[in-house]
Amino acid sequence: MQHWNAIQRLHGRYSKEVNDVLKPKGLSKSQFDLLMTLYHQESATQKSLERTLELSSGAISQTVKKLLAEHLVIRKRINREKRVLLTEQGTKLIQTSAPEIEEIDDRYFRAFTSKDHETFDQLLHKMQSDHF
């Protein structure tokens, strides 16, 4: 129980810091994550976004609708597939927001050695594969 409480406190603190960066830009964390995914993949189907982000089809659909309304993404048919792509405005927003989020991430892991990172990754993988 002690570990879960520590994880919850850490997650709460991290989430607050991330939201403090994203909120003034009009973004939620799930919107940011979707935009980052598109930034790295160029385009994606809603189904692939569901798998990558581990969100329900309804959550992805709502997030995409909000981002469409803000002109941060567009839908486009490519090779018979409906895909979601970043707009120029979406790309610029990610390019300015991502470094701020990376700075927060770096602060949380600054004290880790490379061995610590490796061990941490192994433990997370073990927890996920054993229980999910």
Residue ranges and their predicted role:
Residues 1-25, 83, 92:
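N-terminal leader segment of winged-helix/HTH proteins
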Residues 118-132:
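Exposed, interaction-prone assembly regions rather than primary DNA-binding/catalytic cores
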Residues 12, 16-56:
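N-terminal helix-turn-helix DNA-binding core of bacterial DNA-binding proteins
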Residues 65-122:
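Charged, amphipathic alpha-helical coiled-coil/dimerization segments
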Residues 2-5, 33, 48, 118:
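Active-site phosphate/pyrophosphate-handling residues
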Residues 7-10, 14, 53, 93, ...:
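Alpha-helical linker/hinge and terminal dimerization helices associated
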Residues 56-57, 80:
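Donor nucleotide-sugar binding loop of glycosyltransferases
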